[in-house]
Amino acid sequence: MLHCMARPIPAEVIFNPNWWYRSFGISFEESFYFDRRLRIQNDLQMRRALYERFRLGAPNPGPRPIVGSEHVAGGFVRPALFGCKILFEANAAPNPIPRDLGAEEVLALTVPDIANTWPMNQLIADLESLQNEFGCVCGDFDLDGVLNTALQIRGQQFFLDFYEAPQLAHHVLSVVTEAQIAVGTYMRARTGTLSLSTNRSTINVDPSIFLHSNCSVQMVSPHVYEQFLFPYEKRLAELVRHIVVM
């Protein structure tokens, strides 16, 4: 008889912002993401709460120079780079408002200069301040997915573009992908991680993995995926080493 030693499967628990707000009064307004003092304070409170209530994590966590929370997900950075207005609420994740750009506006899109475009310019300045104060920086932020961001730029018309304006669709996907590569390579160089704010499970495998949100992929057919999205996912995989969340 063959006896096998079962290996434990690591699991991580992520709670909705509304749970944090109702249970501990943590607000997810803009300051949660951009006030570094408040962010460090909230991170400490959240880690203590998880241990005290569920015995998850360390019993006596200390403050750390974190740039993005690993306890909630919210892919607003890349849509914001393309000019999407972001709705912040006390008890919800950030909500990018689609721009619904016209065809000419879409074709004029270029890859943003991340060092000089909000919110990356603000986050980069934050990184520098944390680096100077603590000597290191940890964490990252949810970078969203290729199709997700394309929809936030173009709106639901983007689904029709696959059939009516394929060149336009490819242009949007190309620009979005290059922006994702720019932000991803920058973040990995600064903190060593890319996806803790998307799915903390990566810490149990390889924290440098690029695992991104791609919720909307299930809304397109396999044929559309192969023809339009796969080439850009493949480029991300080759340059940033990533896994897709579907």
Predicted regions and their residues:
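A gly/proline- and charged-residue-enriched helix-loop-helix capping module
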Residues: 90-125
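A generic structural signal for short, solvent-exposed coil/turn residues
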Residues: 3-5, 59, 89-91, 100, ...
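Aromatic- and acidic-residue-enriched segments that line the glycan-binding/catalytic groove
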Residues: 75-96, 146-157
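Intrinsically disordered, low-complexity segments enriched in proline/serine/threonine
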Residues: 19, 67, 81, 98-100
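Active-site loop segments of alpha/beta catalytic cores
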Residues: 1-39, 45, 62, 66, ...
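An N-terminal, globular interaction/scaffold subdomain
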Residues: 31-82
